[in-house]
Amino acid sequence: MPIQPSGKETEEMEAEGDSAAEMNGEADESEEERSGSQTESEEESSEMDDEDYERRRSECVSEMLDLEKQFSELKEKLFRERLSQLRLRLEEVGAERAPEYTEPLGGLQQSLKIRIQVAGIYKGFCLDVIRNKYECELQGAKQHLESEKLLLYDTLLGELQERIQRLEEDRQSLDISSEWWDDKLHSRGSSKTWDSVPPSKRKKAPLVSGPYIVYMLQEIDILEDWTAIKKARAAVSPQKRKADGP
């Protein structure tokens, strides 16, 4: 058989059941109160969020405008500073004090010195070449002059020797002719000359025709003419040989 609880225990169990029911009722009431307060707080927080958003938005806009203004001021200030620096550099460049100008200028001056030295050396070499060429030309001209002088001397010597030889031949022929003429004059045995005879007593030249040559001159004149012709021929013959030569 099952054991039944006693009366005291039954009362305790009923009391516990009533207390649990009361506790459940209180819990439900507290939950309702909590949910109501939470709803009210949510409504209040939403209203506060909108106001805070607008306030923060206006603050951000004002800060952005302020930053833009500051940025414009800084940009203008930076522009003025850069402009003043550029003007100062321009003045330094004009006065040849700027490092951007003096350093490249020093390099250019050094390059100029080197190029001047190279140009001087090249000038010396060119002068040496011109001097050597001048000396060679001068030596060649002197040698050509000496050779031309020797050639001219030999030519003139040959011509003079030929003329002397011809003069010797002419002199010998003249000596022979003069001896022949003297012998002829002495053989006449008359003191009268041809010139002393009056023209009326001179014999007239015979009149001939054909290839005969009539000499109206005296023998001495003919001899002189013959000597002059030989001298002229002797003087003309070297020039003719020179003209016929290369």
UniProtKB/Swiss-Prot annotation:
Cross-referenced InterPro entries: Sds3
Record's compositionally biased regions (Acidic residues): 11-32, 40-52
Pfam families: Sds3
GO terms under cellular component: cytoplasm; nucleus; Sin3-type complex
Biological process per Gene Ontology, one example term: negative regulation of transcription by RNA polymerase II
Posttranslational modification: Ubiquitinated by a cullin-RING-based BCR (BTB-CUL3-RBX1) E3 ubiquitin-protein ligase complex containing SPOP, leading to proteasomal degradation.
Cell compartment(s), UniProt: Nucleus; Cytoplasm
Disordered: annotated segments: 1-57
SMART domains per the UniProt record, alphabetical: Sds3
Gene3D superfamilies in UniProt: 1.20.5.1500
Recorded GO MF terms: histone deacetylase binding; NF-kappaB binding
Primary localization class, coarse: nucleus
Keywords: Apoptosis, Coiled coil, Cytoplasm, Isopeptide bond, Nucleus, Repressor, Transcription, Transcription regulation, Tumor suppressor, Ubl conjugation
Record location of the Glycyl lysine isopeptide (Lys-Gly) (interchain with G-Cter in SUMO2) cross-link: K184, K242
Stretches assigned to coiled coil: 51-98
Biological function: Transcriptional repressor. Down-regulates transcription activation by NF-kappa-B by promoting the deacetylation of RELA at 'Lys-310'. Promotes HDAC1 binding to promoter regions. Down-regulates expression of anti-apoptotic genes that are controlled by NF-kappa-B. Promotes apoptosis in cells that have inadequate adherence to a substrate, a process called anoikis, and may thereby inhibit metastasis.
Domain comment (free text): Contains an N-terminal anti-parallel coiled coil formed by two BRMS1 chains; this region can form homohexamers.
Subunit structure: Homohexamer (Potential). Interacts with SNX6, HDAC1 and RELA. Interacts with ARID4A. Identified in mSin3A corepressor complexes together with SIN3A, SIN3B, RBBP4, RBBP7, SAP30, SUDS3, ARID4A, HDAC1 and HDAC2. Interacts with SPOP; this recruits the protein to a ubiquitin ligase complex containing SPOP and CUL3.
Family membership: Belongs to the BRMS1 family.
Protein's name in the database: Breast cancer metastasis-suppressor 1 homolog
Source species of the chain: Rattus norvegicus (Rat)
Annotated gene: Brms1
